[in-house]
């Protein structure tokens, strides 16, 4: 298909509910089930993943804060895709460390929101699969930065003509939000 259907439960279900919902979602063609239960419960996550099998990918990790957390998650067999957020996991260095650990487990990675931030580091990460494109984050990026990455036909393309991430902070536009 041209489009894949993802569901983000944000840890809303119990393990039993998550398995039941996964069966329903699979019938609707869902291919990605993000945080079906709280990612704090790695043993339960691994049980959900085992029960779901190959019907869809189980993704989590956006609340991970360092390489140790990601290693524990992967060692527990809790995810099919390790999702990371550079704003939480020690920046680009932590993101790339997590990606290297995921690669050692044969696990692809994904980035949690902030596409203009994550696209560049994602391109440098082995096994990088996708960036979560969440409307509110994109709206904030547009509002506060020149050079944000617009999506076209479901794809993001890094701007290779600008240095670094290509973002310039809009100081005047941000001033109204200062506290």
Where are these regions (language model features)?
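Flexible C-terminal active-site loop/helix
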Residues: 110-179
């Amino acid at each position: 298909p041209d489009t894949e259907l993802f569901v983000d439960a944000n840890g809303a279900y119990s393990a039993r509910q998550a398995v039941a919902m996964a069966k329903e979602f699979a019938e609707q063609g869902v291919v990605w089930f993000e945080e079906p239960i709280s990612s704090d419960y790695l043993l339960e996550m691994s049980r959900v993943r085992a029960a779901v099998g190959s019907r869809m990918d189980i993704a989590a990790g956006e609340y991970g804060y360092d390489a140790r957390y990601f290693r524990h998650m992967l060692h527990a067999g809790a995810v099919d895709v390790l999702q990371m957020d550079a704003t939480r996991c020690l920046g680009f260095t932590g993101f790339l460390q997590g990606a290297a650990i995921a690669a050692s487990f044969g696990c692809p990675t994904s980035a949690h929101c902030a596409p203009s931030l994550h696209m560049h580091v994602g391109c440098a990460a082995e096994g990088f699969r996708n960036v979560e494109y969440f409307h509110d984050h994109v709206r904030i990026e547009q509002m506060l930065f020149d050079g944000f990455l617009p999506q076209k036909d479901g794809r993001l393309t890094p701007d290779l003509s600008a240095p670094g991430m290509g973002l310039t902070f809009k100081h005047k536009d941000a001033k109204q939000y200062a506290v």
